[in-house]
Amino acid sequence: MGKSKKYGMNTKAIHTEKRVKLPTGDVMPPIHLSTTYENSQPGEYEYFYGRSGNPTRELFERTMASLEGIENFEEMHSFAMASGMAAVTLIGELVKPNENVVITKDVYGGTTRFFSEVMTKRGIEVNFCDLYDEEKLNSLINENTKLVWFESPSNPGIKIFEIEKYAKIVHKVGAYLVADGTFTSPFITRHLEHGVDIVFHSTTKYIGGHSDTLGGVVTTNNPTIWGNLFDYQKTSGAIMSPFDAYLCQRGLYTLGPRLRLHSENAHKLAEYLEKSEHIEEVFYPGLDSNPHKEVAEKQMDMFGGMLSFYVKSHIDLKVFWENLELFKLAVSLGGVESLIELPRLMTHDSAEGTEAAIEDDLVRISVGLENTEDLINDLEFALNAPKK
């Protein structure tokens, strides 16, 4: 696929070529389950051992790199890991004792837990910061800063950060800017094009897209970082299984159209909620009331399927969620089904008592692919349900 730069995102997702073609002429790539491969001569091989390389995983890694804008994706492929947190851990291996990491306060709870409970035990300084507070950010970064870590949109507050501005700030001290792109995927934001050094996704979410696969993927356009990650991936062993890689590759084929519908549904729900007498405030980058909509328009091709909101004090959240029919009370996101959760109680409890703590009445929605009117009616019924 030498002309990949000329192709659009959907075409790249569907037509990235396998490195090794089979004589059977499969139009859709099969799942390669073998854990070991025959040498033509001692030390001469296309593939050696399942942990160090697998055709199914490699195809997914090449496709992801292509979608992230890596021109030589045949060589600088992405790194597919066993889970989103395995991807986080892989990046964490870049940090050495006595170095420090700065993380935006509004971030996935598992990331908060990993850095505050695991990385600190390795002699690494970890600071949480509201990236909107540039003065605080500048006071925390220095020549010992290895990583500055953010999400845009953030989880669960759906905050939008001006990526290129923060890249300039971070690079002044020689640190790497890391983006969790799970909420967007490269179909919405290609973070590397905006100055990010490392982008990763929990493929469990939108990339897999059907709530039936677990994984994570890391991409960089920096050759030095890539070389280190390549070594870490092979030795850590936390690689994505062939079956999960197959499901993620299949998910990429429909990711563009799915995200378009996720975004359309979420935008309509956000507008409905903003007008509701039961809702205090809605956070969605596509709303005209969002102060960062202009920034979002510059770095997002669509506004995505995630939104959050505060209910007014007269709403009993337990009554609300118990009266929902289509929205399932569950963690995770990015599947075809709509999910609702209370971040403080379900995914961000590890932030309790820290600067990253979440308020009780914040509700997060992962908007699925159901008919919009059905989703609105479901919310309307639950919001107006009488207290017991």
Regions picked out by a protein language model, each given a short descriptive name:
Residues 36-37, 220-225, 252, 311-315, ...:
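Short loop segments at secondary-structure junctions
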Residues 72-73, 125, 139, 146, ...:
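PLP-dependent enzyme catalytic core of the Aspartate aminotransferase-like
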Residues 236-237, 324-334, 382-388:
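A common structural junction motif
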Residues 2-3, 13-15, 67, 73-278, ...:
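Conserved PLP-enzyme active-site core in the AAT-like
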Residues 1-54, 62-63, 363:
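N-terminal "arm"/small-domain region of PLP-dependent enzymes with the aminotransferase-like
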Residues 91, 228-229, 316-320, 375-379:
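Hydrophobic side chains in well-ordered alpha-helices
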Residues 281-363, 367:
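Conserved C-terminal alpha-helix-loop-beta "cap" of PLP-dependent enzymes
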Residues 16-18, 33-37, 51, 82, ...:
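Pocket-edge structural micro-motifs
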